[in-house]
Structures are given as structure tokens and as C-alpha cells.
């Protein structure tokens, strides 16, 4: 499939659905930043930057002016991306996923570099000096080509006459808060009118990409949209330009509940999970990185923005203070030193074989701090309390959950449990982080109250860790009652349960119908029990608190290159 045949909006919709767990209602935060910019930014200087960005040639002084203005805007905003270099290793992502990511980032690097190099025969959009420009003009004139083409079809090539082109990186791109502030302050509009206009444009964006024709029609109802330029988009356009693409990005933030990609927030704790999900959506839809220079397709766009920084708002936040490009700030490590593969202690033993690394313990503490110690907290384990293989804690009011696995000591008992209960396979637990379950239990808040379906095993597990202060409420559902919502939960949340891939044999008691063949997943069971008790499946999206990398040993020996 060529880049011209990309079903762009379908890809966007698929990414919206697949990444809905990471989208947020951001309207209030965007408007708070917009008000801060209106109140404190010198719009005389903004006008000078806008004028400078209309020039065909720009100097070192122009770049300094742009960077200084970007720094002021960044200081005024709460929604920003921070410098965060990401090194992805085998564990949270498989070997194949890491190699796929590395390949796509390299393809994206080549595409971006070709695009910034012009992408048109005979046209260079990079950083020629004034003397080089004059020399080129003379050579082309001598060859009978006049002054040569000044730009690609539909736009003008803007040339920066600067020594260090790396200073241009991350200084462009629009921010909704800045767009709204400029429309309000420079257009002499009420911010509420701007918000209403962008909301109307955003409703169009839920079903199609708004175009200039749509903009013109909406202008009849919302005159402030006349402030949006009718010029086609160009590369390296300033965030201070009121382009249609800037308006579309801003209007996405006005639509709560639309799962807009623009409202994605990336945190270090869930970076691996997000990348894994993006790759899953990509493969399901047949997305790809196109070699053709030009505008990025939806997959290329999200890959670049998310990999640029692992901490912040990749689409709508300020990123002018980030150094480097996406392929520099997110790297893949396929050559980690193999970990020592200790044989498991058979037939029992403590669940805590070794101390968890300090960095991972800190991640656990940060995750637990996000739990509400007074909120309803469901708990479930798979495996016996002396040799658990899975633990889940789930708070239905917020959707926050902790979910981890553990390699068992008693492999024979584990295989029997797999066939008749959880469907976990030993090979999938080989590189799970030892000590993680114990670490979680140790750091749970004092006197916390947990809710469970059957509390005997949970109480035994807590007592093994000296946590007699934690109480466990038993809802005491019958086996049939407990699994009333099973199919509904599996239909909606099966993507949360990726390791229970083994075959489960239905249990059949005399005089009773055969039991379920669905594997017992601790996390999905927590969601299922809550849905059974409340009588409905909540709309609150589950949110992982533990990063995927925390669940696996460092430098797991899964690849040998």
C-alpha cells in the first residue's frame, strides 16, 4: 500500500479506540494554560515572531527570538513534556516487538530527514548560508534555469541561515493553549467564543478530518474562526501560526469523551505498555511507516510524538525544552547481559526468593501511593498462598490496579492448576521479577481493608508477610454467582489478560453443568466480582499503576544477537 492510499482517518479511529485507556479530559487544563499565557505573555513579541516566521530566509537572531519566546511559553504552562530518555529491553515487550519498534523508528528517522531535506527534486529546504544561496542562484542562472524553484508545490521553502541546525529541533508545532490564547488576545475575541467555535470544529473531527471547506461553513456561525489561516500547512510551521492543523489540535481538547489521541498523557510507569498497545493496533490495522517524504501518517505521527518523551503530553504539551529526536530519546537494548537463571526451589519455600532491586521497589511504592487506602480494593491471587503465581489489586472507583506474576516453586502442582484453573504456562513466567508480590504486600497501607471472593488464601498470604493489620472482607458468592458477569468482562477487557494462554479443562460436578473453560485471571476476576456485586460493569477504564518493565527481571535472557 502506498502512502497515497493510507486510510488515514480509519487508522486514527483505530488508534483512538485502542489507546482509550490513556486519553483524558483535558479541557480545563488547556484553558488554564491559555489564561496564564493571555495574562503574562508579551503579545508584541508574539507578533514579531509571527512576522519572522513569514520570512523566506531567517537568521541566527530570528532563531534566538523564537527559542526565547518558546522558553517563556513553556514556563507559563502546566501541560508540558519533560526530557525523559527511554531504554526498552526484553521483558515488557517481546524480542519481536522490540525489533519491530527499532525498525520503525529507523524508517521514521530516514523519512523525517528526507522530508526536512525538501523532498522535491532540485529543492533544498535545509540550512544553506547566504553565500551558498547566492552561488546557487548564479549557477542556476548560468544553466538557463533562472533562479531555480523556491519551494515545493503548494508552499514556500523557508531557509534558516544558521550554523547549528540542532537548535531547530522541537521548536515548532502548535499547542492548543497557545492557539486559544492567540485567537483570544490577538483576535480581540472572548475566550468562551473561541472555545465554542473550537468545540463545533471538534465535533466534526470525531467523524472526519476538518478541511478548509468545513472551516468556511462553520465561520458563518462562529466568526472568530476567520482568524484561522487558509494557507496549506508547511513543514516547520511555528506554534504561533493560526493554521487549520493548530485549530484541529485545539478542538480535539474541547471534546471530552472522544478518546482523542491529542489528549494522550505518557508517564514513565506505563511507557512500555503504551508502546506495546500501539504496536498491537498497528499490526491489527496493517499500519506502516511510509518511505515517501511529506506529512506523517497517523501511525508515524504517534510513534514520533510518544517516543520523543516518555513523560508528558506528546501532542498538546510544550516540548520546546526537550533535546533530541524520537529515535534518539527512545532506544532499544537487545544486547543486555543475560541474567543468572537460578533453578526454582521445588515443593514449597518462601514466595520471596530475593530482594527486589531498589529502583523497582521505588516504582512499587509510587504505584501504591496512587491507591486510595479507604476505597474499595478487590484482591485476588492464582495459585496457593504459599506459592502464588499471580496477584491483582483493583480499585473500581478509579480503575487503578496493580497486577503481577511470579514463577512458582512447585512446578508439578502448577501444571495441574494451569489445566483446571488459570491457564498460565511456565515458559511465560520464566523471567518474572522475583520478590514483587512480597514487595507489594509489604508496602500496602497500614490497616487497609481488602475485598475478596473467598478470603482464606488471601489471609494466609498476608499472615506469611506479617500483615495481620490488613483486613479481608469476603463477599461469599457461590461459584455460579461469582462468574455471572464473566463473558461480559472477558469481552471488554480481554486485552488486560495476555498470559493466560493455556488450555483450561472444564470442571464438571455430578448433577451440575460443566464449569467455565475461561482461564481464571486474577485481574479480570477482580473486575468480574465487582460487576457481580454492583450489578453492572463500570465505565471507569482500568489503569495500570506498575510499569511493565517492573514485572520482569533486568536483562532477561530472551535474545541472543
Swiss-Prot record:
Region named Binding site for the cap structure m7GTP: 53-237
GO terms of biological process kind: negative stranded viral RNA replication; RNA-templated viral transcription; symbiont-mediated suppression of host cytoplasmic pattern recognition receptor signaling pathway via inhibition of IKBKE activity
Site (Important for exonuclease activity): 457
The keyword Metal-binding is assigned to this record: yes
Enzyme class: hydrolase
Molecular-function annotations in GO: hydrolase activity; metal ion binding; RNA binding
Its EC number(s): 3.1.13.-
InterPro entries linked: Nucleocapsid_arenaviridae (IPR000229), Nucleocapsid_C_arenaviridae (IPR035084), Nucleocapsid_C_sf (IPR038115), Nucleocapsid_N_arenaviridae (IPR035083)
Residues at which Zn(2+) binds: 390, 497, 500, 521
Pfam families assigned to the protein according to its UniProt record, in alphabetical order: Arena_ncap_C (PF17290), Arena_nucleocap (PF00843)
Keywords: Capsid protein, Helical capsid protein, Host cytoplasm, Host-virus interaction, Hydrolase, Inhibition of host IKBKE by virus, Inhibition of host innate immune response by virus, Inhibition of host RLR pathway by virus, Interferon antiviral system evasion, Manganese, Metal-binding, Ribonucleoprotein, RNA-binding, Viral immunoevasion, Viral nucleoprotein, Virion, Zinc
Chain sites annotated for binding Mn(2+): 380, 382, 525
Subcellular location field: Virion; Host cytoplasm
GO cellular component entries: helical viral capsid; host cell cytoplasm; ribonucleoprotein complex; viral nucleocapsid
Free-text note on domains in this protein's UniProt record: The N-terminal region is important for the cap-binding activity while the C-terminal region contains the 3'-5' exoribonuclease activity. A CCHE zinc binding site is present in the C-terminal region and may thus contribute to the substrate binding and/or the specificity of the exonuclease activity.
Family under the similarity heading: Belongs to the arenaviridae nucleocapsid protein family.
Chain's role: Encapsidates the genome, protecting it from nucleases. The encapsidated genomic RNA is termed the nucleocapsid (NC). Serves as template for viral transcription and replication. The increased presence of protein N in host cell does not seem to trigger the switch from transcription to replication as observed in other negative strain RNA viruses.
SUBUNIT field: Homomultimerizes to form the nucleocapsid. Binds to viral genomic RNA. Interacts with glycoprotein G2. Interacts with protein Z; this interaction probably directs the encapsidated genome to budding sites. Interacts with protein L; this interaction does not interfere with Z-L interaction. Interacts with host IKBKE (via Protein kinase domain); the interaction inhibits IKBKE kinase activity.
Protein name in the entry: Nucleoprotein
Organism, as annotated: Allpahuayo mammarenavirus (isolate Rat/Peru/CLHP-2472/1997)
Amino acid at each position: 500500500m502506498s502512502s497515497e492510499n493510507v486510510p488515514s482517518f480509519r487508522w486514527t479511529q483505530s488508534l483512538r479506540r485502542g489507546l482509550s485507556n490513556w486519553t483524558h479530559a483535558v479541557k480545563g487544563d488547556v484553558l488554564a494554560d491559555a489564561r496564564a499565557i493571555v495574562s503574562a505573555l508579551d503579545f508584541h513579541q508574539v507578533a514579531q515572531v509571527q512576522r519572522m516566521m513569514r520570512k523566506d530566509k531567517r537568521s541566527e537572531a530570528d532563531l534566538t527570538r523564537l527559542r526565547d519566546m518558546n522558553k517563556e511559553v513553556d514556563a507559563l504552562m502546566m501541560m508540558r513534556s519533560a526530557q525523559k530518555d527511554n531504554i526498552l529491553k526484553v521483558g515488557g515487550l517481546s524480542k519481536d516487538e522490540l525489533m519491530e519498534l527499532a525498525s520503525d523508528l529507523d524508517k521514521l528517522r530516514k523519512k523525517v530527514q528526507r522530508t526536512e531535506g525538501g523532498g522535491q527534486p532540485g529543492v533544498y529546504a535545509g540550512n544553506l548560508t547566504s553565500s551558498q544561496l547566492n552561488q546557487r542562484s548564479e549557477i542556476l542562472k548560468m544553466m538557463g534555469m533562472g533562479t531555480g524553484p523556491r519551494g515545493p508545490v503548494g508552499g514556500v521553502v523557508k531557509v534558516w541561515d544558521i550554523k547549528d541546525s540542532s537548535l531547530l529541533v522541537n521548536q515548532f508545532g502548535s499547542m492548543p493553549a497557545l492557539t486559544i490564547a492567540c485567537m483570544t488576545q490577538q483576535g480581540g475575541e472572548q475566550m468562551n467564543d473561541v472555545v465554542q467555535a473550537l468545540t463545533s470544529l471538534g465535533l466534526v473531527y470525531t467523524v472526519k478530518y476538518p478541511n478548509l471547506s468545513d472551516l468556511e461553513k462553520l465561520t458563518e456561525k462562529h466568526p472568530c474562526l476567520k482568524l484561522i489561516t487558509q494557507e496549506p500547512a508547511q513543514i516547520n510551521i511555528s506554534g504561533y501560526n493560526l493554521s487549520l492543523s493548530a485549530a484541529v489540535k485545539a478542538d480535539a481538547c474541547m471534546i471530552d469523551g472522544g478518546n482523542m489521541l491529542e489528549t494522550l498523557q505518557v508517564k514513565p510507569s506505563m511507557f512500555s505498555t503504551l508502546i506495546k498497545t500501539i504496536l498491537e493496533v498497528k499490526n491489527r490495522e496493517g499500519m506502516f511507516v511510509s518511505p515517501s517524504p511529506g506529512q506523517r501518517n497517523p501511525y508515524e505521527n504517534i510513534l514520533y510524538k510518544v517516543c520523543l518523551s516518555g513523560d508528558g503530553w506528546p501532542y498538546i504539551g510544550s516540548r520546546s525544552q526537550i533535546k533530541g529526536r524520537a529515535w534518539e530519546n527512545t532506544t532499544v537494548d537487545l544486547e543486555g547481559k543475560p541474567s543468572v537463571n537460578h533453578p526454582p526451589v521445588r515443593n514449597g519455600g518462601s514466595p520471596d526468593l530475593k530482594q527486589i532491586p531498589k529502583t523497582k521497589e521505588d516504582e512499587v511504592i509510587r504505584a501504591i501511593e496512587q491507591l486510595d487506602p479507604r476505597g474499595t480494593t478487590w484482591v485476588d491471587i492464582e495459585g496457593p498462598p504459599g506459592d502464588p503465581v499471580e496477584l491483582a489489586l483493583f480499585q473500581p472507583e478509579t480503575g487503578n490496579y496493580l497486577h503481577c506474576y511470579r514463577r512458582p516453586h512447585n512446578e508439578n502442582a502448577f501444571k495441574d492448576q494451569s489445566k483446571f484453573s488459570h491457564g498460565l504456562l511456565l515458559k511465560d513466567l520464566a523471567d518474572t521479577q522475583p520478590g514483587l508480590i512480597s514487595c507489594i504486600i509489604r508496602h500496602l497501607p497500614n490497616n487497609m481493608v481488602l475485598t475478596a471472593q473467598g478470603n482464606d488464601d488471601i489471609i494466609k498470604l498476608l499472615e506469611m508477610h506479617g500483615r495481620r493489620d490488613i483486613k479481608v472482607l469476603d463477599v461469599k458468592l457461590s461459584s455460579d454467582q461469582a462468574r455471572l458477569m464473566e463473558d461480559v468482562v472477558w469481552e471488554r477487557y480481554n486485552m488486560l489478560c495476555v498470559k493466560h494462554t493455556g488450555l483450561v479443562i472444564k470442571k464438571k460436578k455430578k448433577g451440575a453443568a460443566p464449569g467455565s473453560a475461561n482461564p481464571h485471571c486474577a485481574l479480570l476476576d477482580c473486575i468480574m466480582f465487582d460487576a457481580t456485586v454492583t450489578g453492572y460493569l463500570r465505565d471507569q477504564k482500568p489503569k495500570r499503576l506498575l510499569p511493565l518493565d517492573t514485572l520482569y527481571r533486568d536483562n532477561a535472557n530472551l535474545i541472543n544477537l
